[in-house]
């Protein structure tokens, strides 16, 4: 089989590889007197094969972003990732990514998951070092390796029972990877010339990869919307900067995997903790006496203190701005969900929202619950949804759409439901105006507490 020579390596990548080559003597010296490591017993391939998987990355810096996280503690980050990921990637390149083999060892000692050594591997000594410090898998980039070099490195990896994530960026590299026997393909969406992102690369290349292989999409996986878009083409995602750049990595991980998700009607600390453990990002606290799940501000403070991993939303039907100001003053409340009925006109809706925002001095986001089956007992028109005498599902949907459009610019999020909410019924999601999808949440029906998920 021919010995393919990689295309001209982009300058940034070439510089990194050139520098990494100068590190090889130091790496060899670092592990010179240690016994041979034991083969790995943790399989990244097995964990990824199930699908809907995430390789979450420990990374403190990158060429495109510079310093990502000043307070970088790989062990602490790994403890968070271990709750959600199928594997953990650890940067080991020191100059551009701030990595080190000690970071790899710290993560391997912390987690039960397989650990990927993320490095620019060009020599077998790097693979032995990776295994010594706890790696269960390595990254091999076809953009910097010939076929012969890949085979040499793959043989060393197999010696230690390490999985290989083979990175590809072109159709030619996909064909090479297939010929080389790769079983985990990492499609890198980043342009190695200018560091830009092209997410169409994943579906374009995925169709050329055999069905029995595992496909991972790398780079540019910034939110749950991207995950949902690319999910049909891949088994999982490798995500680094989007997580380690965030102040709250645990929250960022849940939001990436599940989207913005609110469990409403929490009445106890245990319920809040269960919501967070299930992947929720927000907890809804109901301050409405008519609700069987209503709580007092005192109880709210106890719940909030018990689960700092959630962002809390105060839910009420009140139209009194001063009452909303009192709720916004509760420490830990990050959003106010106005659940009152339609106010009779768009102008009245605007006035209510503006008054609440002014009274709360922008201390919390404003969310508006909107019935996508129209205001209670009515259907409507564009200007005043409550005035129309038309009947039927179509006009009801139009009334809900116009209500949502009327208030969208004045609120931070729309919570879309059927009727007044709490009915356990749903509406046709296709009626959600496309231009509003990015700021909407869907109120879930079913057994309480019901989830509310972002639609993007």
Predicted regions and their residues:
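Hydrophobic faces of well-ordered beta-strands that scaffold small-molecule active sites
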Residues: 54-58, 88-90, 115-118, 138-140, ...
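C-terminal helical cap(s) of enzyme catalytic domains, especially alpha/beta-barrels
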Residues: 199-209, 231, 243-261, 297-307, ...
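N-terminal active-site wall of soluble small-molecule enzyme domains
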Residues: 65-158, 162-165, 173-176, 202-205, ...
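Glycine-rich phosphate-binding active-site loops on the catalytic face of alpha/beta enzymes
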Residues: 132-149, 186-196, 233-253, 280-292, ...
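Catalytic cores of alpha/beta
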Residues: 122-133, 171-180, 220-239, 267-278, ...
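An N-cap/entry alpha-helix motif that binds or orients negatively charged groups
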Residues: 2-71
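Glycine/Thr-rich beta-alpha phosphate-binding loop at enzyme active sites
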Residues: 60-71, 77-98, 177-206, 287-291, ...
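Glycine-rich beta-to-alpha transition loops that act as phosphate-gripper elements at the mouths
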Residues: 59-61, 70-72, 97-98, 117-125, ...
